[in-house]
């Protein structure tokens, strides 16, 4: 399941095209098409050149996620507001590093799997959307849903739900427990390892 989760997150995140007036489901469809062509073009190099892969992830993938919003959601209002600006910046950077490290290898596992997207559901606010999808992979389909926010005319993903399990909720439980026992500085250090 971890490998499938990593693959699906990598599929979602990879795109280098600027989407300014795209619908959220269109943004996700284009992202999957982009990963397919990116992997086709660079698969061998991705498997052997970790620095190149990390650079591609950081320049093309991570900008499509709202890492700062994800950080706030994961840590919660109390912890976030108690942190200094420097700690907030350090956490966001460390969390992005961890996300990149965790998911960059799974990009090479993409092998043209088919994805079906349902039309997006608007959120309570016009800049929020929810998109349901199904990844058709050998061994069984996986339901993957996305929560997106529109900022500066661009859609960004801030949560991914795999078979009903929120990525943010999983991180939230682990990270908050770590902070309660060891403090925020310890969590930041562990994310950088």
Where are these regions (language model features)?
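Short beta-strand edge/turn micro-motifs at domain boundaries
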Residues: 141-169
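Low-complexity, intrinsically disordered terminal/linker segments enriched in charged
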Residues: 162-193
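Sec-dependent N-terminal signal peptides
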Residues: 6-10
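Early exported N-terminus immediately downstream of N-terminal targeting peptides
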Residues: 23-103
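Positively charged n-region of N-terminal signal peptides that target proteins for export
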Residues: 1-5
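Surface-exposed, charged secondary-structure patches
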Residues: 101-142
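Boundary at the C-terminal end of the N-terminal hydrophobic targeting segment
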Residues: 18-22
């Amino acid at each position: 399941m971890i490998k499938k989760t990593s693959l699906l997150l990598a599929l979602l995140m990879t795109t280098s095209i600027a989407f300014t007036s795209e619908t959220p489901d269109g943004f996700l469809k284009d992202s999957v098409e982009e990963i397919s062509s990116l992997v086709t073009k660079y698969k061998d190099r991705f498997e052997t050149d970790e620095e190149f892969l990390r650079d591609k992830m950081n320049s093309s993938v991570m900008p499509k996620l709202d890492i700062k919003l994800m950080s706030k959601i994961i840590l919660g209002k109390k912890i976030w507001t108690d942190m200094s600006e420097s700690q907030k910046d350090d956490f966001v950077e460390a969390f992005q590093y961890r996300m990149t490290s965790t998911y960059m290898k799974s990009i090479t596992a993409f092998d043209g799997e088919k994805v079906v997207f349902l039309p997006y559901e608007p959120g309570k606010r016009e800049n929020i959307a929810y998109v349901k999808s199904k990844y058709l992979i050998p061994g069984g389909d996986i339901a993957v849903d996305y929560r997106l926010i529109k900022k500066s005319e661009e859609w960004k993903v801030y949560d991914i739900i795999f078979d009903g399990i929120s990525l943010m909720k999983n991180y939230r439980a682990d990270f908050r427990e770590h902070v309660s026992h060891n403090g925020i500085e310890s969590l930041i250090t562990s994310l950088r390892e």
